[in-house]
Amino acid sequence: MLAGLSPHLSNLRRSLTQVLNFALVLSTAFMMWKGLSIYTNSSSPIVVVLSGSMEPAFQRGDLLFLWNRSPRAEVGEIVVYNVRGKDIPIVHRVVRAFGDDEKSPKETNGQKKKKVMSSVKKDSIAAGALHSDSALVSHRILTKGDNNIADDTELYAQGQDYLDRKLDLVGSVRGYIPAVGYVTIMLSEHPWLKTVLLGIMGAMVILQRE
């Protein structure tokens, strides 16, 4: 009876080993991703170009490597940002930047800044006025795709005329590999390919067991 159980135990042991190896691969990949995310200070340190709006600089399917530890994004720099309320990364170039000592478009119109200054005057706190005013004017940028005619104002969230460096940017592009990410685009545009890949992986596992 023990002799009859031996093959079953051997198969079970082999199956468990394969499951553990697969889990080890997944956990290692996850740890590497989290480590890279912490190192670059970016929630998505690697992204895929999804459109042709940055041609000829970047083509659809290019794999981009991001860095998000710079305090500013300079004009001409290519950045990746998320539109507020959406989870779609957009890769575009900075065409205007408003530093801490500059006025953003809204402040030029004298709307938001006047409200803050009036409230500060009512409180009669001069020191607080300077601090509040400095904190208000954070580093803001305006972006545009190289292959687009207009800037990204229409892409931003409703009522948003610029991007906030700290709140909206995923990172700045520091390197890329051409066309490598096109597989991701194919899988998202053709869901049936995911089923095919899963079937191939399952077949490989079965063949290895035999």
From Swiss-Prot:
Belongs to the peptidase S26B family. Its EC number is 3.4.21.89. Component of the signal peptidase complex (SPC) composed of a catalytic subunit SEC11 and three accessory subunits SPC1, SPC2 and SPC3. The complex induces a local thinning of the ER membrane which is used to measure the length of the signal peptide (SP) h-region of protein substrates. This ensures the selectivity of the complex towards h-regions shorter than 18-20 amino acids. SPC associates with the translocon complex. GO terms for molecular function: serine-type endopeptidase activity. It is an enzyme of class 3 (hydrolase). It is a single-pass type II membrane protein. The C-terminal short (CTS) helix is essential for catalytic activity. It may be accommodated as a transmembrane helix in the thinned membrane environment of the complex, similarly to the signal peptide in the complex substrates. Residues 196-207 are annotated as: C-terminal short (CTS) helix. Residues 39-210 are lumenal. PANTHER family: SIGNAL PEPTIDASE COMPLEX CATALYTIC SUBUNIT SEC11. This is Signal peptidase complex catalytic subunit SEC11. It is found in: Endoplasmic reticulum membrane. It catalyses: Cleavage of hydrophobic, N-terminal signal or leader sequences from secreted and periplasmic proteins. Its main location: endoplasmic reticulum. One of its GO terms (cellular component) is signal peptidase complex. The gene is SEC11. One of its GO terms (biological process) is signal peptide processing. Keywords: Endoplasmic reticulum, Glycoprotein, Hydrolase, Membrane, Protease, Signal-anchor, Transmembrane, Transmembrane helix. InterPro entries: LexA/Signal_pep-like_sf (IPR036286), Pept_S26A_signal_pept_1_Ser-AS (IPR019756), Peptidase_S26 (IPR019533), Peptidase_S26B (IPR001733). The chain crosses the membrane at residues 22-38. Residues 1-21 are cytoplasmic.
